[in-house]
Design a protein with these regions (language model features):
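Active-site-proximal helices and loops of the catalytic beta/alpha 8
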Residues: 1-175
């Protein structure tokens, strides 16, 4: 998922491949403390809040797996304490040395879009899910359905930069 959102790709296969673990036993995240702190190929630093939210929507709206949201340290982007030269080679890194243990981190976890996906997941507990793209790899659709219009729902993450017309889009939702 992290690699997909780094390259601005919401292809459904990135959100449904659970190799070596069954979906009901998977733990999903966009980034973790380890990828963030260890500076794997600069991926954490390159992820904007917008793309973290797209990834979060894709992993959290589904039926199976537990989703974890990493709360980045406050004002990330500083050095690792290596004499001013961070692991990234330019003096920047994920820690500013302004944060102390127990300090609040980023407020992104409180974002209304993050909260909406969390509410969607909670409202759809136990319902089947289907993950697909809505026309291209910049529009991800997660359907949750029980066969009743009153119980069915859909989450759409649209990274196209403009409104997406979903008319005629095939779904598993009840009419």
């Amino acid at each position: 998922v992290r690699n997909a959102v780094q390259f601005k790709n919401l292809g459904a296969s990135h959100f449904t491949s659970h190799s070596k673990v069954t979906e009901d036993k998977s733990v999903n995240w966009v980034e973790s403390h380890d990828n963030f702190a260890n500076g794997e190929a600069n991926i954490p630093q390159e992820l904007s809040d917008e793309w973290i939210k797209y990834g979060w929507a894709g992993v959290t709206a589904q039926k199976n797996g537990m989703s974890l949201f990493f709360d980045r340290p406050y004002k990330d982007g500083g050095t690792y304490g290596t004499g001013g030269v961070g692991t990234y080679g330019n003096g920047s890194g994920p820690f500013t040395e302004n944060s102390k243990l127990g300090d609040a981190g980023s407020d992104l976890w409180k974002d209304p879009e993050v909260a909406a996906v969390n509410h969607f997941r909670n409202a759809m507990v136990g319902e089947a899910s289907n993950v697909s793209n809505c026309g291209d790899d910049n529009c991800l659709m997660v359907e949750r359905y029980a066969g009743s219009a009153a119980q069915d729902g859909m989450m759409v993450a649209n990274a196209n930069g403009s409104d997406k017309n979903l008319a005629g889009q095939s779904t598993k939702l009840a009419n």
